[in-house]
């Protein structure tokens, strides 16, 4: 049997020809610009940007399979404290998908790519969270 591996982007319906072309454009630009780091960011419930920094050589992997993170990073207040007690029984009813500090996947949007002029050899991408 020959099984085709399905990427996370494909599973989420986020692998159109247009997105694939954008991904290739970003990967080429990142390589040509000598970027070493890429900040993958998302917006929290307060409108603040939070993020993780990846080595740019792994960016193709992030575009295809996303980046995992613990869901409690989305449940912080403005002083960076986790607001919900995710290990208590009733949180499953209040916040489905967050119980037990489950994982969330972040999928970068290639259309948001920027090279940061104030951070040497660093790119930036906005990500969409997927539960």
Which positions does each model-derived feature cover?
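ATP/Mg2+-dependent ligation/transfer catalytic cores
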Residues: 1-131
